[in-house]
Amino acid sequence: MEININCDLGEKSKFHSIENDPELLNIVNSANIACGYHAGDVDTMNMVIKISKSNGVSIGAHPSFNDPENFGRKKINLSASEITKLIVDQYEILQKIAEKHKENVTHIKPHGALNNMACEDIELANTIAKAINSVDKNIIFLVPTGSKMEIAAKKLNMKIACEIFADRNYEDDGNLVSRAKDHALITDPEIAKKHVLSMVKNQALNCFSGKLIPCEIDSVCIHGDNQSSLATAQSIKENLLSNGLILKPLNKMKKFS
């Protein structure tokens, strides 16, 4: 069984360090690269693409609202044409840099508030899906499993990779437990690796209550903001491999080839 590990990278900003990015690129199969609107710059994009190419990691754009002051985490209401321009412009920024390295952007995953809003708002999800489809009909749309973006992408017969979050607990409705709650995050590496393996093997969300919600799972999103989360990410990868899972970049998975 194939599975992918992805991570948001190149997010250099006052909120986020990129010092762990080179190490993360030894763990992940696909990189979601900040395109300068919430974080990152030309130098960070070049760095992440260069290491990704060397490590066989597939390259993805991680577009956001143009809101570096809030790391793209503030909700902003824009028109459909403004959202489309937002997505297309950031894809083109990263694609032009990728081409200098003889690489291509092969997936897109929205960031922060844009992603969160589109998980619940079908009109916004439709707009994002259409924008992504307009830049390249072969591009993979990386979406949270069970989200409105998954529904929107299926309507357009897009290539869809559904992701779960390795370090987050889920509510019984399939949504992430709010960060305001004590049990939102999973910080114990042993619990995290079992949590991920169970969901991947069962193709179901493993809710905090114990409820299972059947869903499609193609990718696991990890984070590496500190040494503890780096260790958790490595533990998750090793546990997947030792249990017979085959790790692949998104664009190399049989589902998309």
Segments predicted by a language model, with ranges:
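Flexible, glycine/charged-enriched surface loops at secondary-structure junctions
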Residues: 98-106, 203-216, 246-253
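Active-site rim beta-loop-alpha module in soluble metabolic enzymes
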Residues: 146-204, 212-213
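Glycine/small-residue-rich loop that forms an oxyanion/phosphate-binding "nest" at active or ligand-binding sites
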Residues: 68-107
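Glycine-rich tight-turn/loop motif centered on a GG-T
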Residues: 17, 21, 31-38, 69-84, ...
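Conserved, mostly hydrophobic/aromatic
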Residues: 8, 62, 108, 222
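C-terminal domain-boundary segment and adjacent tail
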Residues: 139, 231-257
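Acidic (Asp/Glu)-rich catalytic clusters
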Residues: 22-26, 47-60, 99-101
